[in-house]
A protein has these predicted regions:
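Bacterial N-terminal signal peptides that target proteins for export
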Residues: 1-8
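Extracytoplasmic/secreted cell-surface and envelope-processing proteins
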Residues: 56, 166-168, 247-249, 360, ...
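Acidic-residue sensor for enzyme active/binding pockets
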Residues: 42, 49, 196, 208, ...
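Short Gly/Pro-enriched turn/cap motifs at secondary-structure boundaries
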Residues: 91-92, 134-135, 212-216, 259-260, ...
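Outer-membrane beta-barrel pore domains
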Residues: 130, 282-284, 292, 300-496
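Outer membrane beta-barrel
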Residues: 96-299, 375-407, 412-431
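N-terminal periplasmic/intermembrane-space "pro-region" immediately following the signal or transit peptide
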Residues: 21-119, 271, 387, 391-402, ...
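Bacterial N-terminal signal peptides
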Residues: 8-18
Length: 496
């Protein structure tokens, strides 16, 4: 220790001083007295060393807790040469990178990350039927959030959204990773059903999700048990949730983020990646499975608990009858969603089918009440290909280069294409004026073809440009077809 070395040096100097004094002064003490004096000096040094060791074990600044001297900059002068006589103060490592800004404890067991998801969109239409007001710029997502881990076990996230001039809670949950096979999650988060819906937002290949994603739940409140078995070959999740209508989140309910019907949804998903551990690269990217939900609910004309469906350009093309004689949910709601993806090299494909069945009723008059079951379905197949050779993945991307003005590198460029459709059960339009949906307003089906170009400037910034052409069956007066929708959609997205 540096202080001990200084004390030893002082003792040596004192010894030489005493010997010099004895050699030059006739009245100097005898040898026995000199040895006694040296022994006293040695005891004094030993006492000082013990006090120094005690001070380093119990720094006053931490109330006796052990403190690490590791800092985020180990080569800094303060960490290499602390001020003598002061206790070392530990600095938790701070990091900044593609995954956001993070602060963590010296042992890495506790981490707090500051992140954000910002999406600024442009919607432009070249058809003659979409209202001119639909041509617009808008913030689709404004989501600063925090997430982290406690004790290497408990993950958490709190994510609000300020887009659209309002504030909502998008995610708010805690997940306990008891083991890879057992993860308990509680709070508000995405339900375990739709494949595209479960994909992290920053890895969606199109500006808007496909039509079948309109049939699966978005974010719900509840508790879920899930995990990975056999090294990730089998993934499962089962949960008990408040329940939401097709494509919706609990913040869109009549009373936001509260149970609006008193009934609970069972939701579950089983997903297999049978070759994830194999050496065959052309098989590792194959995954398939199915998700589903079940509940028995009863709404009312005032609280119908039924969805409306939108086009890729976010225009409503189907809704149930509303008003005093509105159609409302009245019985079982079941969803079934088989799904598949395959990624190899720069190529990827994602496909899914969804069927949503809902028993409904409508009090047409005081004496007439109609009931029935509506089975709506949708499917999609989407393709993606990296022109710059990056590896396609369901939930990740690392560009081979980044785009910085004045430097080499063009980022990652990706071509995407998809076909998707949503079909409404003909039973929704049966019965004339007593039907559950008005055929002069709502379409019987929507079929869309989309192409797009994505530019990943780096891992955090993405620019997307899509064109979606949607054709309809029905949806206009006199049983005519609603005019086609031609939508140009763009998004500037920042995620860190």
């Amino acid at each position: 220790m540096r202080v001990a070395s200084v004390l030893a040096s002082v003792a040596v100097l004192q010894l030489f001083s005493a010997l010099a004094f004895a050699a030059t002064d006739a009245s100097a003490p005898d040898v026995a007295a000199l040895l006694k004096r040296l022994d006293e000096q040695e005891q004094r040094i030993k006492s000082l060393e013990e006090r120094l060791a005690l001070q380093q074990r119990k720094p006053a600044a931490t109330g006796g807790a052990s403190v690490s001297t590791e800092t985020s900059n180990p080569a800094s002068p303060a960490s290499v040469n602390p001020t003598p006589g002061t206790a070392a103060i530990a600095v938790a490592p701070a990091k900044a990178g593609p995954q956001g800004f993070a602060i963590q404890s010296p042992d890495g067991a506790n981490v707090l990350r500051f992140r954000a998801n910002l999406a600024f969109d442009g919607h432009w239409f070249s058809d003659q039927s979409t209202p001119a007001t639909a041509d617009t710029w808008l913030f689709r997502k404004v989501r600063p959030y925090i997430e982290g881990t406690l004790d290497n076990t408990y993950d958490f996230r709190l994510m609000p959204d300020f887009a659209g001039g309002k504030a909502i809670i998008v995610d708010a949950y805690v997940a306990a990773r008891i083991a890879p096979q057992f993860v308990v999650q509680v709070g508000k988060f995405k339900g375990p059903v739709g494949l595209e819906r479960l994909q992290p937002d920053q890895y969606n290949r199109f500006v808007e999700l496909g039509l079948p994603s309109s049939l699966v739940p978005n974010r719900d409140e509840g508790a879920q048990l899930g995990g990975d078995l056999f090294g990730g070959i089998v993934g499962y999740a089962v949960g008990y949730f408040n329940g939401v209508t097709d494509g919706a989140s609990t913040d869109a309910a009549g009373t936001p983020d509260q149970d609006n019907d008193g009934k609970k949804d069972w939701e579950g998903r089983l997903f297999l990646q049978p070759f994830i551990t194999t050496d065959r690269a052309y098989l590792r990217g194959l995954g398939f499975g199915a998700g589903g939900t079940y509940v028995d609910i009863t709404g009312s004309a005032a609280n119908a608990l039924l969805p409306a469906y939108r086009t890729p350009g976010q225009q409503i093309f189907f809704s149930y009858r509303s008003g005093a004689t509105a159609t409302y949910a009245d019985g079982r709601r079941e969803r079934w969603a088989p799904q598949l993806y395959y990624y190899v090299g720069p190529f990827g494909v994602l496909a899914e089918y969804v069927q949503s069945s809902q028993q409904v009723s409508r009090q047409v008059s005081a004496s007439v009440r109609r009931s029935g079951q509506i089975d709506n379905s949708g499917w999609q197949t989407s393709f993606s290909y990296f022109l710059t050779g990056e590896r396609e993945l369901y939930n990740g991307l690392t560009p081979h280069s980044t785009f910085e003005p004045g430097k080499p590198g063009i980022g990652a460029w990706e071509l995407v294409a998809r076909y998707h459709e949503l079909r409404i059960d003909p039973a929704a339009f049966a019965g004339g004026i007593e039907s559950f949906s008005d055929p002069a307003v709502s379409a019987r089906s929507a079929r869309a073809f989309g192409v797009g170009l994505n530019w990943y400037l780096n891992q955090n910034i993405k620019w997307m440009l899509d064109f979606e052409r949607t054709r309809f069956e029905g949806g206009a007066p006199a049983d005519a077809n609603r005019a086609d929708e031609n939508a140009f959609l763009t998004r500037f997205q920042l995620v860190f």
